[in-house]
């Protein structure tokens, strides 16, 4: 099936030429191209046109979940008749296994999986395995992390057709082999139930039920049912059912893996004994033997991913399988905001390796744990054949890859100009900023304020709130789903001002924002580099009244570069507007949820309400006040402690996170007694 682009717009401005150049480059076989597109020029629409022209399965890589969700929603709008999928980390919370030698503290792995994102990941892989050509996967950096072997997954696809002669129990065994679980009481996702000659399967990667009706040993009917009403929505003559998990193995592979694990364990024990370190030798012996026993009896163990090399049949050092293995060789890769995403790809391997080094050196894991890892940058390059780097500020790496040939897209179809940039002194900057904010809020416009640190963002937010301005802050400690909701609340007017650090730069589509204020603009560094300033200024480029105020006591080289480049783009847009009689028009974008998965709590209101009349929202289980808490107060306490646990894990403060986790367990026991 071919891609079918649906849009009420036609390419205008620089878009037709950019689409033509990028399409020609792919058809020529160019390995790398750069699309330099300013904010609001329609880069996503251009890429959608290129995808439709070249008709190749496409992986769009974004550097965070928020932007990935935004791209996913836009691509679904452009290609409603094709497969547009979403593949990001399915962890709501993840604390990796770690060992801290300085305090001799071992932290066990702890996690919470988002069931809906797991379903979306499975659906993405299933559609790729189906052989369909019209598949677009929007992914975060998760696509370079290890997953199951494509061979093992393909071997567990269940193909059925009407009139097929197959014993019902044989089909049930196949379902179990594909990791579907029998549950005759509750038909949850990834489960099946049996009632007489009818087998109902809750498909792991869909929100539908597959009903198979037998007549003796013959499949008489294959139906699709709504998972709520159980009304029939479709009938099939044949059907392919894909596995319920991305990690598959067989009994034969498991037995072989255990033998290899045993051999490597003997070698590692001998290694530690040769060093005269009996404690580490005993530790690795006990841990691995326990894991092997669990695998034999239950088929899994805690941390089984550290043995993935044995189950996949890989050699030491051999790269893991990942999402890229499921794409055909000639797929198209689009790297959005490449100046940020490319360095992120390169940094994943080093961080993973550093954490596992302690686990291996101190006898907690076999050296095979190193092979459960993300791809290295070189491995990533070997697996990608044609890449389009998309950025308003491409870095030197991307420019070198395309040998300096850049496709520019500087004209906005709406006629909107790049924002005016004004430099103001830091003296009385807060009072000046307050005055500017009041002017914008009177016009029902929004303001972004960028600071250098998270603490400054929180304090600025608190200051503005105390002066009656509806304000929120956003930084790396705010969870992914909460971040999306906060941005929606900014757009719908719940907040007038959003204060942030680095998350207000790339790709955020906020047409209501007319002012971007950059505090400490002259503090040269990563957050105030030429590229960072240009990206930050671009957040005001979607509004007809867009303006940027840089608060600084002198103009740095980075500031000057940003001012000059912005002026060049303004001039080009003005000339285009005059030549075509265009009057700049305000972008109007419908308010809608980017992704509605999961039952995530609402974005925390960052205006902290007084809690003087309430009991504390965080308490330790040993505190006598816990006994006087109501059930509702305990639930609130658990929720807040969970938030603190997640924040500690993100900061790599594993000891603190583990303490919070233990308190949550105790508080939950108290809750059960209420």
Residue ranges and their predicted role:
Residues 57-69, 86, 280, 440-462:
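Conserved strand-helix element at the start of the C-terminal RecA-like helicase core
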Residues 478-500:
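Conserved helicase ATPase core of P-loop NTP-dependent helicases/translocases
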Residues 81-89, 303, 446-448, 460-482:
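Conserved RecA-like helicase motor-core motifs
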Residues 28-50:
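Walker A/P-loop
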Residues 69-77, 97-99, 459-463:
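Short amphipathic alpha-helical segment within the helicase RecA-like ATPase core
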Residues 1-34:
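Conserved pre-motif I regulatory segment
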Residues 34, 87-432, 436-442, 461, ...:
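N-terminal cationic and glycine-rich segments that engage phosphates or anionic surfaces
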Residues 27-34, 56-57, 133-135, 445-446:
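Pre-Walker A (Motif I) flank of P-loop NTPase domains
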């Amino acid at each position: 099936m071919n891609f079918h682009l649906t849009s009420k717009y036609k390419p205008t401005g620089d878009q037709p030429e950019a689409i033509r150049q990028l399409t020609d480059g792919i058809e020529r076989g160019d390995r790398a191209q750069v699309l330099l597109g300013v904010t609001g020029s329609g880069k996503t629409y251009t890429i959608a046109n290129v995808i439709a022209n070249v008709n190749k399965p496409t992986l769009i890589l974004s550097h965070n979940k928020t932007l990935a969700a935004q791209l996913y929603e836009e691509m679904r709008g452009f290609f409603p008749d094709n497969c547009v999928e979403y593949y990001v980390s399915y962890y709501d919370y993840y604390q990796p296994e770690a060992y801290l030698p300085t305090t001799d503290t071992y932290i066990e792995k702890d996690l919470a999986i988002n069931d809906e994102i797991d379903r979306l990941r499975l659906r993405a892989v299933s559609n790729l395995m189906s052989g369909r050509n019209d598949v677009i996967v929007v992914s975060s950096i998760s696509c370079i992390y290890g997953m199951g072997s494509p061979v093992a997954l393909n071997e567990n696809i269940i193909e059925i057709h009407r009139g097929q002669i197959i014993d019902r129990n044989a089909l049930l065994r196949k379902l179990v082999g594909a990791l579907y679980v029998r549950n005759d009481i509750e038909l949850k996702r990834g489960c099946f139930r049996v009632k007489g000659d009818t087998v109902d399967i809750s498909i792991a990667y869909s929100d539908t039920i597959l009903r198979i009706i037998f007549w003796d040993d013959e499949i008489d009917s294959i139906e699709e049912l709504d998972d709520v009403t159980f009304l029939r929505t479709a009938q099939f003559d044949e059907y392919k059912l894909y596995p319920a998990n991305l990690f598959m193995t067989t009994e034969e592979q498991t037995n072989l893996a255990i033998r290899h694990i045993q051999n490597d364990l003997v070698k590692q024990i001998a290694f530690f004994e040769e060093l005269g370190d009996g404690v580490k030798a005993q530790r690795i012996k006990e841990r691995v033997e326990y894991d092997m026993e669990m695998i034999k009896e239950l088929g899994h163990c805690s941390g089984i991913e550290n043995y993935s090399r044995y189950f996949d049949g890989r050699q030491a050092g051999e790269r893991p399988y990942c999402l890229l293995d499921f794409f055909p060789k000639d797929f198209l890769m689009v790297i959005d905001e490449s100046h940020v995403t490319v360095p992120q790809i390169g940094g994943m391997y080093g961080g993973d390796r550093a954490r596992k080094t302690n686990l291996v050196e101190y006898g907690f894991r076999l050296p095979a744990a190193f092979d459960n890892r993300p791809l290295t940058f070189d491995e990533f390059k070997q697996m990608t054949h044609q890449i389009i780097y998309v950025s308003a500020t491409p870095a030197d790496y991307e420019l070198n890859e395309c040998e300096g040939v850049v496709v520019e897209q500087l004209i906005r179809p709406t006629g909107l100009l790049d924002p005016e940039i004004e430099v103001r002194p830091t003296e009385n900057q807060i009072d000046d900023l307050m005055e500017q904010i009041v002017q914008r809020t009177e016009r029902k416009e929004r303001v972004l304020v960028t600071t250098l640190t998270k603490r400054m963002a929180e304090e600025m937010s608190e200051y503005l709130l105390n002066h009656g301005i509806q304000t929120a802050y956003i930084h790396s400690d705010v969870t992914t789903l909460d971040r999306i909701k906060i941005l929606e609340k900014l757009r719908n007017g719940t907040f007038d001002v959003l204060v942030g650090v680095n998350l207000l730069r790339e790709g955020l589509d906020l047409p209501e924002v007319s002012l971007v204020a950059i505090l400490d603009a002259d503090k040269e560094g990563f957050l105030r580099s030429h590229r960072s300033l240009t990206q930050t200024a671009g957040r005001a480029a979607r509004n007809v009244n867009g303006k940027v105020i840089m608060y600084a006591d002198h103009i740095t080289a980075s500031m000057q570069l940003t001012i000059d480049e912005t002026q060049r783009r303004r001039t080009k847009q003005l000339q285009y507007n005059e030549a075509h009689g265009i009057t700049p028009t305000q972008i109007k974008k419908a308010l809608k949820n980017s992704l509605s998965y999961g039952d995530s709590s609402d974005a925390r209101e960052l205006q902290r309400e007084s809690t003087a009349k309430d009991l504390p929202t965080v308490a330790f289980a040993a505190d006598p006040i816990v006994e006087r808490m109501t059930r509702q107060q305990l639930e609130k306490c658990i929720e807040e402690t969970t938030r603190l646990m997640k924040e500690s894990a993100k900061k790599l403060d594993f000891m603190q996170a583990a303490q919070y986790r233990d308190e949550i367990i105790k508080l939950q026991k108290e809750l059960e007694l209420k």
